[in-house]
Amino acid sequence: MSNILNKIVATKKIEVANRLKQVSLANQRAQAEANNQDVLLKPRGFIQAIEKKITAGKAAVITEIKKASPSRGILRELFVPTDIAQSYEKHGAACLSVLTDADYFQGCNDYLQQARAACSIPVLRKDFTIDPYQVYEARAIGADAILLIVAYLELNQMKDLEACANELGLDVLVEVHNASELEQALELKTPLLGINNRNLKTFEVTLQNTLSLLSMVPNDKTLVTESGILSHTDVQLMRDHHVNAFLVGEAFMRAADPGAALSELFS
């Protein structure tokens, strides 16, 4: 595990312990279950939205709402999640990914709630999930999917977190960075597999990371390429290799109009 991931996970353990003191697990679970009965808050079908785009022959783009990152600092000074969400939806995003980590990405749960309320597309809670408490919390704040990152989770942990998510109607995006992580990810039930093109140790980005792992991905998985998609050439390279789902954040966050940037990149 990289130094930054070590720090994030250590911080996250403290965060979860503190959250438990503020809102009990039972209360989070009750809110999550209540949301599942609410017509406005029940899960919107994250995987379904991606597969619908792909079936229609379109690129399925998960567009990110992210204020800052550890490697790049502040990405967007004028940060209004509702406006960004509406712009993304208007320009054809399949889903949203909203950063809720406060310490390293300057995110918060409110950003996810604001973004989801402003649009009708499904929302991924982009955070560092280590504990079932966070899964219940994700559904309690309205998330439609969660992220599991193989780099810092044991297989049994991931299976438990996935089972918890599925019980609540949450979809799961499992993220890998290399072949050994991919082998573990394939042990999970989720059909949604993300390959991150960013090396979490060096923060270098290369699309070759996705291409080099393609042969290991079974046909029954929906592959999402993450990070480093910056040009029409990048998009076409992936689509030529039958990769039709993308997670893009930084390129859009730096644009004056994130939704217009989405349209331009995938036109």
Curated annotation (Swiss-Prot):
SUPFAM superfamilies: Ribulose-phoshate binding barrel. It comes from the Bacteria. One of its GO terms (biological process) is L-tryptophan biosynthetic process. It catalyses: 1-(2-carboxyphenylamino)-1-deoxy-D-ribulose 5-phosphate + H(+) = (1S,2R)-1-C-(indol-3-yl)glycerol 3-phosphate + CO2 + H2O. GO terms for molecular function: indole-3-glycerol-phosphate synthase activity; phosphoribosylanthranilate isomerase activity. The keyword 4Fe-4S does not apply. InterPro entries: Aldolase_TIM, Indole-3-glycerol_P_synth, Indole-3-glycerol_P_synth_dom, Indole-3-GlycerolPSynthase_CS, RibuloseP-bd_barrel. Gene3D superfamilies: Aldolase class I. Its EC number is 4.1.1.48. This is Indole-3-glycerol phosphate synthase.
